[in-house]
């Protein structure tokens, strides 16, 4: 049986993550307040950020940038802005 959380990103009850995917207090906050669906949305944006900005995950500054973007996306409702990216038309 899956657990449900009130997802602050989607503003609704939804299936929660199966386990804590991120370390520390932020990871606990994500586990308690973010749904699988919202986490999937973040993973998509994260991949775009890493690729388009050519981030190196071995660089502590790049990891901090990604963490800041993640917090903004998941908890503050900020969308990830990638210069020059045009979403495909539907």
Swiss-Prot record:
Belongs to the Fe(2+)-trafficking protein family. GO terms for biological process: cellular response to oxidative stress. Keywords: Iron. Could be a mediator in iron transactions between iron acquisition and iron-requiring processes, such as synthesis and/or repair of Fe-S clusters in biosynthetic enzymes. InterPro entries: Fe_traffick_prot_YggX (IPR007457), Fe_traffick_prot_YggX_sf (IPR036766). Pfam families: Iron_traffic. GO terms for cellular component: cytosol. PANTHER family: FE(2+)-TRAFFICKING PROTEIN-RELATED (PTHR36965:SF1). This is Probable Fe(2+)-trafficking protein. GO terms for molecular function: iron ion binding.
